[in-house]
Amino acid sequence: MSSRARLSRVSIAALLVSVAFSGFARAEMAISANDGKVKLVDGVVQVQKDGKDTVSFIDLDANPPKVVAEIEAPTSVVGPPMSVAVGPKEDFAIVTGAMKVSPADPTKQIPDNKVTVIDLATEGAGIVGTLKKATGIGTPAAPRTPKILATLEAGAGAAGVSINKTGTLALVANRNEGTVSVFTIAGKTLTAAGKVDLGNKDAGPSHVVFTPDGKSALVSRDADHKISVLSIDGAKVEYTKRDMNAGLRPYGLDISGKGDVAVVANIGIGQGDNDTVSVIDMAATPSRVVSTVTVGQTPEGIKMSPDGKFVAVAVMNGSNKPAASPFYKANGLLQVYSRTGTQLAKFAEVPVGKWCQGIAWTSNSRKLAVQCMVDEQVQVFNWNASKLTTAGTVKTTGGPAGIRTAEK
């Protein structure tokens, strides 16, 4: 080999290392939990006897976006669409399953408590594999299909799940027993570390999210209309007895990357009224609800952009109702609100599919993915900080019911 060729290969390797550590060598994945047990037929949920739940791994960097792998794992559309959490290193994910088909009556569902841990490691798609392929030094390993590492138990109706920024603790909201399950994390191994009792077995804890410093968390309680504050010290998690009130049935919940504000989607009672999104001032002592905006019928999904400038909301808009209902609309809505301090203002809106669920942003705040249950697809949009444009549509096996990207 000539010295020029060797130099060229070294230069390529150096360039790839530079690109890799700039965050561009690895595809950005959204993980979608898909409920195959139920379908919505003219506004009525019907249980599917032989339906299979799946988890899809979606490459959002591809043009158009595409599913690169799919495995079976228990999940559920019941509960907020935050039934997925991704480790900060993107090496593992957690998926919860709030409901299962009743063994006694296959036309009905009963609460489940499943927590599935999934290995996401793929050397062939990462920095090492990229360098090997480009430089010819060694043989790159083939990308591995994500695999289930463990299936654990939380509480009845295991729904919203989050992982702290250091990847050492996970919390799961248990809708059917009024508790939050605590799991410690070592590498990719989860260990049950007890439960937090919220003082009301019928509270309906829906989602739980950490503050960026990991010292506290918020829990939405849609059955008794509260948002509770938890304190965290290592693996010790306690209910502080501090509750906030935002609106009817607080459900989806998110906290900004800086931890200065939180947003909560109040889904209401589903009777055709316009529902709301509230902003919580996390910098105040104590934290408190400070503003609310009207968004439309049933804001199921909510997610702040990683740069903290925008809030995306998936509004059902009556698309989940019978066609004969006076509140029925043929499509849902994806809305984007700009944020100034603790105030939100509608900035953009596009129609999406029916009975839409979760939302995920890419880490650069330039793409949005929204799940639509009836259509069994994830719609992906480009976002240039002023306008939403279609980037592509991804089909899933089963109705997409929960979605997340890594939150670093």
Residue ranges and their predicted role:
Residues 1-13:
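Bacterial N-terminal signal peptides that target proteins for export
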Residues 4-6, 19, 23-408:
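Predominantly soluble domains enriched in secretory-pathway, periplasmic, or organellar proteins
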Residues 11-21:
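Hydrophobic helical h-region of N-terminal Sec-dependent signal peptides
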